[in-house]
Each structure stands twice: as C-alpha cells, then as structure tokens.
C-alpha cells in the first residue's frame, strides 16, 4: 500500500499532510458535536444554517485574497502558518461558549484561519507534483481525512464511554490544534519571485474554461449545504444517549469512506480525466440526498453516510486539482483562491435555504440538494467543449 501510493511523493506534501492530519484530528472532534452543541445552547434549524453558511463563507471570502497575496509576495508558508494558528486560538475560545450566539461568533471566526491557509497550501501542493496533481491532492486529503476519522472516533469514545461534556471535548481539541503547528516548521518553501499583479488583473486573466468550471462548481455548492444537516437528520430518529452517539458514529463512517477512497479517486482522475470523476461525484451526491429524504433506518443511514464520504472523495481534491490544471503557475494561488471564494459565497445561501426548508420539512432540504446537484451536471454537459481532460 505504501509503495503503491506514496512512492515519489514530495516531502512537503507529506509534511502538510501531517499538519492537516493533526489539525483535522482536532477539528473532527468538534464537527460531529457542533450541531448538537448549538441545539443544546438554544439554536434551531435556521441558526444551524446561518452558522454553517457563515463558517464556509467567511473562510472562503479570505481565500481569494490569501491566494492573491501569496502570488504577489512570492511567499506561501507565512499564510499557511498564520491560518493554522488563528484556527487553534478560536477553537480554544469556542470551548467557553455559554449561548448559541457565542458559537456563532467563535465558530465563524475560527474559519478565518482556514481562509488564510487553504489557497496558499493548495498552491504549494500543486507546485510540488505538477505531473501527478490528482495523486498529490489525494494523498493530502487522505491524511487530512485519516485525522478526521481518528478525531471522530476519539470524540465518540470520550462521549460514550467517559461521559465528557461538549465543552471538555472542544477544549481538548483546541490543544491538539496548537500541536499541529509543529510539523509545519519543517516545510521548505521554494523561493519565488514576487508577481507584479493586482487582484483585478489576476481575476481577469483567468482562462475562460476555468471561469466556467468555477460557475459549474458554484452551482453544485448551492446544493452542497452544511454537513450539520446530515448529522441532525440522523439525530431526529434516535433518543437519549443514542441521539448523540449514533450521529457521531455515522459521521465517523463518513470519514472512513472518505479516507479510503480519496487517493484512489485522485489517481483515477489522473488516468481518465477529472471531469468524469467530478460528474459522477455530483450524480452520487444527488442520489445520496434523495436517500436522506426518504429513508430513516440505522442501516439506511449507514449506507448513506458511506456514500456521502465517497462523494467527497470524488469531488473535493479533484475539483482543486482541476482548477490547478486550468490555471497558469503564476496565477495558481489566485485561481485556487477564486475557486474557494466562489464555493464559500455559495455556501451561505445554500445553508440558509437548507435551514429555512428544514423548518418546513427536513425531507424538502435534501430534495432541494438533489435537484440543484442535477442542474450542475447539466451545466457541465452544456459547457463540455470548454473543458479539457
């Protein structure tokens, strides 16, 4: 397994993978309990949508600027380091929340760190393995998600067997986030010349195929509302300790399947083309959303959360790799930042719409997601002549 997938992998990708492993170990101790923490402090469906949407949008608005600044300055590591540190600090503040408004503030501001680090980090990954970007992003995402798997297992154990409170778990997660900064010190950044560009020129110079792909993926982002609704959907059908334990278990299952398939689908996209893999991912998301709308047994939830993990394995790293394929090296940080920002700007209305529909009928939320996902596939087909394999 090691020889097959990691042979020839750049050291920076492995180091960044370790950083992401530790950071996601921290984050995924928080994420499966976050929607239930919000409910416990008085939040409701629309509040879940607001917090989920703001978290994605705040981080993504910063991504285009961080990507542009990293291109312009010729430096990427400083943004990556600042981002991980910022996230760790606001996770610590989150542990002391007493009302849902505190969660709204701290959970949203924690995403500033993600906004600072993501595009520059992805640009480093893209530059390290130019001929095998799908593999490079797949390896990074797999290590990231392995941390997520272990983190969600830990939170399940802490809650189910040791009776830890939500706040205690979040505090422990914040300490782990601070530890994730250690491997980052050893990442070696290649010297790059500062680019004489401004943000307007950088965006204008993005090629048309890239702009069209960002449009298509933004439509899909309108369907891909916050994971918290999937967790709450599972919680609806259980009571007592099971109403917390089962959603955490299912979220762990999601991460296991994500980790298992991230590298294989990255390598597959290197061979058959990213467009095909991404389209199949969109289609599977649509089917999965319909499943959440109409099935509610534990067995069906296990299958659906597994599919949900496979969807992310198909689209997450491959969308980033495809953006890198469609952009020039000089503007890669700007291109990735623009992509992430578009995703985040779509995330806020997506989650707000999902929250509004949830208050009418939770099933409608998932029917909405399935419908918009199909529209994104149709757009992919309409613009197919602009996209290279």
Language-model region placement:
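Juxtamembrane intracellular "pre-TM" segments in multi-pass secondary transporters
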Residues: 1-10, 189-216
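Cytoplasmic helix-loop-helix junction between adjacent transmembrane helices
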Residues: 106-146, 322
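Structural signature of the two symmetry-related core transmembrane helices
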Residues: 78-92, 174, 276-291, 370
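Pair of pore-lining "gating" transmembrane helices in MFS-fold secondary transporters
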Residues: 5-39, 108, 209-229, 306
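C-terminal membrane-cytosol helix-exit motif in multi-pass small-molecule transporters
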Residues: 174-193, 376-384
